[in-house]
Curated annotation (Swiss-Prot):
InterPro entries: Ac_CoA_lig (IPR011904), ACAS_N (IPR032387), AMP-bd_C (IPR025110), AMP-bd_C_sf (IPR045851), AMP-binding_CS (IPR020845), AMP-dep_synth/lig_dom (IPR000873), ANL_N_sf (IPR042099). Signal peptide: none annotated. ATP binds at residues 387-389, 411-416, 500, 515, 526. Autoacetylated. Deacetylation by CobB activates the enzyme. Catalyzes the conversion of acetate into acetyl-CoA (AcCoA), an essential intermediate at the junction of anabolic and catabolic pathways. Acs undergoes a two-step reaction. In the first half reaction, Acs combines acetate with ATP to form acetyl-adenylate (AcAMP) intermediate. In the second half reaction, it can then transfer the acetyl group from AcAMP to the sulfhydryl group of CoA, forming the product AcCoA. NCBIfam families: Ac_CoA_lig_AcsA, PRK00174.1. It is an enzyme of class 6 (ligase). This is Acetyl-coenzyme A synthetase. The keyword NAD does not apply. The gene is acs.
Length: 652
């Protein structure tokens, strides 16, 4: 692997970077050798009401997984993201909002955002929301989504943000699991010129008889589109905040008080509510933001992620705002109405740091120079990538075309469960290799292990684990600590298992190779195969289903579903469309299968276990080495599947 061309650190970055190679080595060694000293010092990036004495109190031991950081300290997240900046930087822009329609944009100062958050915090209190209550937020990419999240944190309520692309069924499941007392939504969302029926989806979700906890729905008027209204339950955002005071004293929170729940797909069944707490999470989000993006005061920063994903929590809002940065929030999509939209937004707002996903980069790359037509992007200094491993071709295109061959690309590997960046370059400290996430961030101790959990040394490939805790780590799964332990700490004893595989080269750089469990990564979003299979099997005509991922040029992975129909049912183009729409309705558009492969039988072992390894190879057209098929109950099934595959048109 050493033949790969290394990108050296550009002189303009080296001259003013926050961390150089020598500092990285020294700080990294301190962070793993004396974590209490290191994190005790770094914790001062925040303002604490009651300073902490204890720094790290963590255990990955079987039966005793417990993660606590700064546990005797108190603080408030919203005060750290807003109040502490007011005296010196109250007039600095906190959020630049760029609408789906380019003629709509606005700048919101720290002073204005603070006022709006105080008003909404008082509104939540008026509605009877107390510290510890869960509030569901199902909003478009508008500043009010940030206001709602910060207001929850301000009063100590726990927010559960649900991505606006999820279906009513998925919304209901998350409301039920978290026992949300309030839902905050919008009449409609707007994306690529189309309206998204958010309020209607909430109405449908709340018709589920198992939703019993919701008392009110607060509705933001975004489009003025026609919506149904339930008197007494539904309340207009503007009516409520008009009457609210803009004075509010932020609640004193313990560092380990819950901050948010964010649902993420697992390899088994229903989504898991990942729980993050206040102190360690914000220290980690702020520190990683500052160092990985080499943030300097005055930088204009744009993270293209939706607030409904962890990237939107940590790196659209909380990390940047804790550092007093100007963060750009974009309602639209990178290639609408023209392929150059992303580049146009960069020029329009003079963006210095751009953080986006490989799926967007690949979609723009497919447009060639149309993606940069009429723009110069000269304001850019740092580029970043998130959501899935980026292929070297897309990395080089991004570096060359978007960044004019002068901006380091920080390819960040991390997860919902990690709270912030884990393996990532630092612009002034790391030479880059296209496609590699490079080296661990401070305090992160990655290892590669074999199937038995034995650590592998040197240049090698294996399962990626983390051997000790870090402040941003999720503390548990909401209401199910046993599942937390089972999912992340039972595969390899005394280690956090990421679910990803990786290889390490002779320079010690990490290359993420993708999931090793049954989780798909579609356009940078995690989807559990079990979740999609459950949705398919719930269809009245389907007997059995198995879902695998196949490589896709734009999305990274596409969804390939093997479907066995009930006796007497026949495949048809109508049923094909019906089944795809069914999954779309059950989970959301992201989960719609790209390919349905009708088949009478699936390859199973004698104990009835589906051999997914074989299904993955057949779907990907890789039939050179199907491995050992002797354990199959009926080896003839494989030939039949291969024949059926010949007739299937594959997505490009």
């Amino acid at each position: 692997m050493s033949q790969i061309h290394k990108h050296t650190i550009p002189a303009n970055i080296a001259d003013r970077c926050l961390i150089n190679p020598q500092q990285y080595e020294a700080m990294y060694q301190q962070s793993i050798n004396v974590p209490d000293t290191f994190w005790g010092e770094q914790g001062k990036i925040l303002d604490w009401i009651k300073p902490y004495q204890k720094v790290k109190n963590t255990s990955f031991a079987p039966g005793n997984v417990s993660i606590k950081w700064y546990e005797d300290g108190t603080l408030n997240l919203a005060a750290n993201c807003l109040d502490r900046h007011l005296q010196e930087n109250g007039d600095r822009t906190a959020i630049i909002w760029e609408g789906d329609d380019a003629s709509q944009s606005k700048h919101i100062s720290y002073k204005e955002l603070h006022r709006d958050v105080c008003r909404f915090a008082n509104t939540l209190l008026e509605l009877g929301i107390k510290k510890g209550d869960v509030v569901a937020i199902y909003m478009p990419m508008v500043p009010e989504a940030a206001v709602a999240m910060l207001a929850c944190a301000r009063i100590g309520a726990v927010h559960s943000v649900i991505f606006g692309g999820f279906s009513p069924e998925a919304v209901a499941g998350r409301i039920i699991d978290s026992n949300s007392r309030l839902v905050i939504t919008s009449d409609e969302g707007v994306r690529a010129g189309r309206s998204i029926p958010l309020k209607k989806n909430v109405d449908d979700a709340l018709k589920n008889p198992n939703v019993t906890s919701v008392e009110h729905v607060v509705v933001l008027k975004r489009t003025g589109g026609k919506i149904d209204w339930q008197e007494g339950r539904d309340l207009w955002w503007h009516d409520l905040v008009e009457q609210a005071s803009d004075q509010h004293q932020a609640e004193e929170m313990n560092a380990e008080d819950p901050l948010f729940i964010l649902y993420t797909s697992g390899s088994t069944g229903k989504p898991k509510g990942v729980l993050h707490t206040t102190g360690g999470y914000l220290v980690y989000a702020a520190l990683t933001f500052k160092y990985v993006f080499d943030y300097h005061p005055g930088d204009i920063y744009w993270c293209t992620a939706d607030v409904g994903w962890v990237t939107g929590h940590s790196y659209l809002l909380y990390g940047p705002l804790a550092c007093g940065a100007t963060t750009l929030m974009f309602e639209g999509v990178p290639n609408w109405p023209t392929p150059a939209r992303m580049a146009q937004v960069v020029d329009k707002h003079q963006v210095n740091i751009l953080y986006t996903a490989p799926t967007a980069i690949r979609a723009l790359m497919a447009e060639g120079d149309k993606a940069i037509e009429g723009t110069d992007r000269s304001s850019l200094r740092i580029l970043g990538s998130v959501g899935e491993p980026i292929n070297p071709e897309a990395w080089e295109w991004y570096w060359k075309k978007i960044g004019n061959e002068k901006c380091p690309v920080v390819d960040t590997w991390w997860q919902t469960e990690t709270g912030g960046f884990m393996i990532t370059p630092l612009p002034g400290a790391t030479e880059l290799k296209a496609g590699s996430a490079t080296r661990p961030f401070f305090g992160v101790q990655p290892a590669l292990v074999d199937n038995e959990g034995n650590p592998l040394e040197g240049a090698t490939e294996g399962s990626l684990v983390i051997t000790d805790s870090w402040p941003g780590q999720a503390r548990t799964l909401f209401g199910d600590h046993e599942r937390f332990e089972q999912t992340y700490f039972s595969t390899f004893k005394n280690m956090y298992f990421s679910g990803d595989g990786a290889r390490r080269d002779e320079d010690g750089y990490y290359w993420i190779t993708g999931r090793v469990d049954d989780v798909l990564n579609v356009s940078g979003h995690r989807l559990g195969t079990a979740e999609i299979e459950s949705a398919l099997v719930a269809h009245p005509k389907i007997a059995e289903a198995a879902v695998v991922g196949i490589p896709h040029n734009i999305k990274g992975q596409a969804i390939y579903a093997y479907v066995t129909l009930n006796h007497g049912e026949e495949p048809s183009p109508e049923l094909y469309a019906e089944v795809r729409n069914w999954v779309r309705k059950e989970i959301g558009p992201l989960a719609t299968p790209d390919v349905l492969h009708w088949t009478d039988s699936l390859p199973k072992t004698r104990s009835g276990k589906i051999m997914r390894r074989i299904l993955r190879k057949i779907a990907a057209g890789d039939t050179s080495n199907l491995g050992d098929t002797s354990t199959l109950a009926d080896p003839g099934v494989v030939e039949k599947l291969l024949e059926e595959k010949q007739a299937i048109a594959m997505p490009s």
